[in-house]
């Protein structure tokens, strides 16, 4: 019975940790990542379609992304969608593909992204604490239903707290690593 509470808590905490890592991928480091274009949608035959489903998106070097559409007629639409996304660069259409040239990041931008990473970490910690509350409620329900004794409940609360502390540590480590990566020139 308690194992199902622990398993659900661990599963939910892993989801929160993975969501944090996904959020981190949207932060620009010293080199560009194609993930910055992940949330851009293009009008494709009257449907809003993810950019990566209508074009090949490649990071050609540390500061350039190339977007080559599978249909040449898509060039203008892709260029407009990227411009409208307001990601901090102006797309350049060379007739074959759309190129994005990212300027090197300033120290100020790096510090700003490090702050964002810290805020994302805090948000993830709040999620972990809410998951702990749900797990504790599950233990409380089992105790109320007389499925477990008071001593077992006490041990269960301690185990729930251990799991929470473990995931908070993992989040702190992930934030620390991301901050180091962001601030490294």
Curated annotation (Swiss-Prot):
Lineage: superkingdom: Bacteria
Principal location: cytoplasm
Name assigned to this protein: Ribosome-recycling factor
Residues spanning the signal sequence: none
An MF annotation (GO) of this entry: ribosomal large subunit binding
Residues passing through the membrane, by range: none
GO-annotated biological processes: cytoplasmic translational termination
Localization terms from the record: Cytoplasm
Alphabetized UniProt keyword annotations: Cytoplasm, Protein biosynthesis
InterPro entries tied to this protein: Ribosome_recyc_fac, Ribosome_recyc_fac_dom, RRF_sf
Family: Belongs to the RRF family.
Listed GO CC annotations: cytosol
SUPFAM superfamilies on file: Ribosome recycling factor, RRF
Protein's job: Responsible for the release of ribosomes from messenger RNA at the termination of protein biosynthesis. May increase the efficiency of translation by recycling ribosomes from one round of translation to another.
């Amino acid at each position: 019975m308690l194992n199902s509470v622990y398993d659900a808590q661990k599963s939910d905490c892993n989801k929160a940790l993975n969501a944090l890592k996904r959020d981190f991928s949207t932060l620009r480091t010293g080199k560009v990542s194609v993930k910055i274009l992940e949330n851009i949608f293009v009008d494709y035959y009257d449907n809003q379609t993810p950019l990566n489903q209508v074009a090949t998106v490649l990071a050609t070097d540390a500061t350039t992304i190339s977007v080559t559409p599978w249909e040449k007629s898509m060039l203008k639409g892709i260029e407009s969608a990227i411009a409208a996304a307001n990601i901090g660069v102006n797309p350049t259409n060379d007739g074959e593909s759309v190129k994005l040239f990212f300027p090197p990041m300033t120290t100020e931008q790096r510090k700003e992204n490090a702050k964002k990473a810290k805020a994302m970490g805090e948000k993830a910690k709040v999620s972990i604490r809410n998951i702990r509350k749900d797990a504790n409620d599950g233990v409380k329900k089992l105790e109320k239903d007389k499925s477990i004794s008071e001593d077992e409940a006490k041990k269960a609360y301690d185990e729930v707290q251990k799991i929470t502390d473990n995931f908070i540590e993992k989040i702190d480590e992930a934030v620390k690593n991301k901050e180091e990566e962001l601030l490294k020139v």
